[in-house]
C-alpha cells in the first residue's frame, strides 16, 4: 500500500500568509507605469509559493520516495527514492537554531535528508522503524509547530493592519 505524506498545512499557510503580508501593498503603492507588472509578479510569486510547498513523500512496502514540485526541481531540488533494505542508519546533525536534521544513510554511503515538515510525521516515523528497525523515537519536526502558527498569526495581523491603513 502506498501512503502519501504532504507538506504540513501549517507550513504552507504560514509561507502564503507571510508572502501576502509582504506583497499585498506593492501593487497599490507602485507608480502607474508599474501597476500591471507588479500585479503580474504578485500572482506569479503566489503561484511559486503554492508550487514550492507541494513537495511530498510516498512510502510503500519496498521503498520511500521524495517527490519535488516542478518549481522545486527547476531550482535544483531532486526527487529521490531509497529502498528500505538499503538504509543502514540515520544520522543526526544539529542546526544553528538548536534542533536537529536527520539523514538517511544508505549502504552506498549516500545521504538523503529525512523530511521533517510533513503531515502525519509520527506515522511516518513509525513506518521508518517498522521497515528499517532503526530507532527514531526521539525525532521531531525541525521546528516546533507553534512557530508556524505564530508566523501565520503575525502575518494575518500585518494584512489586517495594511487593510485598515488602506481603507482609512
Regions found by a protein language model. Give the residues of each.
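Juxtamembrane boundary at the C-terminal end of a transmembrane helix
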Residues: 158-168
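Hydrophobic membrane-targeting signal helices
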Residues: 24-25, 48, 163
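Conserved beta-hairpin
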Residues: 44-81
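Alpha-helical transmembrane segments
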Residues: 41-44, 110
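Hydrophobic alpha-helical transmembrane segments
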Residues: 11-14, 27-42, 167-168
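Juxtamembrane amphipathic/hinge helix adjacent to a transmembrane helix
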Residues: 116-144
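N-terminal membrane-targeting/pre-transmembrane regions
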Residues: 1-30, 109-110, 134-159
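Non-transmembrane, membrane-adjacent beta-strand/coil modules in membrane-associated proteins
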Residues: 66-124
Amino acid at each position: 500500500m502506498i501512503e502519501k505524506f504532504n507538506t504540513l498545512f501549517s507550513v504552507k499557510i504560514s509561507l502564503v500568509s507571510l508572502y501576502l503580508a509582504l506583497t499585498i501593498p506593492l501593487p497599490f503603492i507602485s507608480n502607474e507605469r508599474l501597476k500591471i507588472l507588479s500585479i503580474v509578479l504578485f500572482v506569479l510569486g503566489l503561484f511559486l509559493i503554492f508550487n514550492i510547498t507541494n513537495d511530498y513523500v510516498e512510502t510503500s512496502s519496498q521503498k520511500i520516495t521524495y517527490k519535488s514540485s516542478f518549481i522545486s526541481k527547476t531550482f535544483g531540488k531532486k526527487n529521490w527514492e531509497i529502498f528500505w533494505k538499503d538504509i543502514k542508519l540515520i544520522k543526526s546533525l544539529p542546526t544553528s537554531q538548536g534542533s536537529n536534521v536527520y539523514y538517511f544513510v544508505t549502504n552506498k554511503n549516500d545521504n538523503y535528508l529525512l523530511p521533517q515538515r510533513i503531515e502525519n510525521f509520527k506515522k511516518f516515523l513509525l513506518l521508518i522503524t517498522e521497515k528499517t528497525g532503526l530507532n527514531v523515537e526521539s525525532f521531531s519536526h525541525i521546528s516546533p509547530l507553534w512557530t508556524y502558527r505564530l508566523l501565520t498569526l503575525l502575518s494575518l495581523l500585518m494584512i489586517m493592519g495594511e487593510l485598515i491603513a488602506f481603507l482609512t
